[in-house]
Amino acid sequence: SRGLGDVYKRQVYENGKYWLFGGKKGCDQEELYLWCSDDNIWGNYYPKEGVCVKKGLRGSRMAGDFFRVNGQLYRPSQDCLEHYGAGTVIWCVDSVSLDRYEETEVAVLYPQPRSNYPDGLHTINFSDNWCVIDGLHIKPDFWRGGLLRLDKKFGLGFFD
């Protein structure tokens, strides 16, 4: 996976191949790309540019590792329509190949307004009998807001 210039990569083995999902630097996490390897998890992934399989602020940014329930593959993603990591969307992966990627939305998770993390749920991972969720609490900060506006205007990369 080295040299692909991608960010937030997630790998999964499906249909006899290793699949690498991720964004590309400079795409502002609004696009999800797919690469494939026939060898192994550290193999030569192709195509070098990747195949764009999803566009938009809702569902393009990964929100954790793929997981399986009763053999079915699922992909967690972030809902960034309102802001980074406002919620988590779970997709059932229906088909994965370089020619065709299809998924169906099956669940959406948003934080409770009065919780300790009312502003987002941006990561979910499963392991054995464990589920780990990373919540978001945005504290008002004059300097951060100013930097965010400058970063967006001039593409400084502070929040990449």
Ranges and model annotations:
Residues 9-26, 34-35, 72-80, 91, ...:
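Hydrophobic core segments of beta-strands in well-ordered, beta-rich domains
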Residues 6, 35-58, 98-110:
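Blade-edge beta-strand/turn elements of extracellular beta-propeller
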Residues 9-10, 62-65, 119-122:
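Beta-propeller and closely related beta-sheet repeat lectin domains
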Residues 134-160:
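Membrane-proximal basic amphipathic "stem/tether" segments
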Residues 55-62, 114-119:
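Short glycine-/Asp-/Thr-/Trp-enriched loop segments that recur within the blades
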Residues 1-8:
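Short, small-residue-biased leader/transition segments that mark boundaries at the very start
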Residues 60-67, 73-77, 81-107:
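Accessory, usually C-terminal, subdomains that scaffold auxiliary metal cofactors
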Residues 27-36, 82-94, 141-144:
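Structural motif
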